[in-house]
């Protein structure tokens, strides 16, 4: 097939590689404009652009994919299909309906659940048993197009947003190649989504990671995993941000009298861990990062910082 690929972040790179390796003709890659980064404000390529350049593929970077001039330029590539993976802009009907097989999107959830941004992190935060990848034929709605193929993935007990991201990126890559094969062979029957079963998730921001210890330890442990590596779960100690990278849940702590503790209070300090009271249960903290410092296990943190039972976190 003659393919135009539209994508921007790391998640999309694996799919682009898989399309190339499967022998499809990638006529062009469309990605977001280069972004200034760092103090020097030097322009940085998106991960997808890096991959396209490495393969000598033409790269297009429209400020607005809806602009008529870009739409007409895209038309000149005569694509059989446009593959869209985390591109970052909404597409007009003039692009969606342009190629013979339409625009095919790779979405990291089991649609119609978790439409929208950040479905990977939310699957972990919400404690889902399964996540997965859906390929769909795009329409003008937000992740509302007809379903083409689905692959489920069972989440591990200690799944993080980062580990699930990597797994679903790989799943999405091979599922998209299978989808292209099925479309070309005429063996796929698109299935309409059941809108009554749909859920939407919002984009994550750094502020979302602030831990509310009135919540249960189980909820907070999932938040920690879901926001690892970005934007990360955090609290404050003596006015400094303390990121919590790994923790376990404990229902009871034998040496603690429940009625004497408040949510957010450090209740035990051991050699290699410390424990925080929550609205329900306790968090046993295994790995942290104090503001301005590197990530470290809790034992290393406790050897370099004085922490005593009774200290309130979040202040």
Swiss-Prot record:
Keyword flag Nucleotidyltransferase: no
Cross-referenced InterPro entries: Fmt, Formyl_trans_C, Formyl_transf_N, Formyl_transf_N_sf, Formyl_transferase-like_C_sf, GART_AS, Met-tRNA-FMT_C, Met-tRNA-FMT_N
Keyword line: Protein biosynthesis, Transferase
Presence of the UniProt keyword Transferase in the record: yes
Residues that hold (6S)-5,6,7,8-tetrahydrofolate according to the record: 109-112
Top-level lineage group: Bacteria
Reaction(s) catalysed (UniProt annotation): L-methionyl-tRNA(fMet) + (6R)-10-formyltetrahydrofolate = N-formyl-L-methionyl-tRNA(fMet) + (6S)-5,6,7,8-tetrahydrofolate + H(+)
Task of the protein: Attaches a formyl group to the free amino group of methionyl-tRNA(fMet). The formyl group appears to play a dual role in the initiator identity of N-formylmethionyl-tRNA by promoting its recognition by IF2 and preventing the misappropriation of this tRNA by the elongation apparatus.
Protein's name in the database: Methionyl-tRNA formyltransferase
Organism: Lachnospira eligens (strain ATCC 27750 / DSM 3376 / VPI C15-48 / C15-B4) (Eubacterium eligens)
């Amino acid at each position: 097939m003659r393919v135009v690929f539209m994508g921007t972040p790391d998640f999309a790179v694996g799919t682009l590689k898989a399309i190339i390796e499967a022998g499809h003709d990638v006529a062009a890659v469309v990605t977001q404009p280069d972004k200034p980064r760092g103090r020097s404000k030097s322009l940085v390529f998106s991960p997808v652009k890096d991959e396209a350049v490495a393969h000598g593929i033409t790269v297009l970077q429209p400020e607005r994919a809806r602009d008529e001039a870009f739409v007409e330029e895209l038309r000149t590539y005569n694509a059989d299909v446009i593959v869209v993976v985390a591109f970052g802009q909404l597409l007009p009907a003039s692009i969606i309906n342009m190629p013979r097989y339409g625009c095919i999107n790779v979405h990291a959830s089991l649609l119609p659940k978790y439409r929208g941004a950040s479905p990977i992190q939310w699957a972990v935060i919400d404690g889902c048993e399964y996540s997965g990848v859906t390929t769909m034929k795009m329409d003008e709605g937000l992740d509302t197009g007809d379903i083409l193929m689905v692959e489920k993935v069972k989440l591990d007990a200690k799944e993080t947003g980062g580990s699930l991201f990597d797994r679903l990126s790989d799943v999405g890559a091979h599922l998209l190649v299978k989808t292209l094969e099925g479309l070309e062979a005429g063996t796929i029957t698109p299935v309409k989504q059941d809108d009554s079963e749909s859920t939407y998730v919002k984009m994550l921001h750094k502020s979302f990671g602030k831990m509310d210890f009135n919540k249960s330890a189980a909820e907070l442990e999932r938040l920690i995993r879901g926001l690892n590596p970005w934007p990360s779960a955090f609290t404050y100690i003596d006015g400094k941000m303390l990121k919590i990278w790994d923790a376990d849940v404990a229902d009871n702590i034998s040496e603690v009298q429940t009625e004497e503790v408040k949510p957010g209070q450090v209740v035990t300090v051991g050699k290699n861990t410390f424990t925080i009271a929550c609205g329900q249960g306790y968090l046993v903290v295994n790995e942290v990062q104090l503001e301005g410092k590197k990530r470290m296990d809790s034992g290393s943190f406790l050897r370099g910082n004085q922490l005593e039972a009774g200290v309130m976190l979040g202040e």
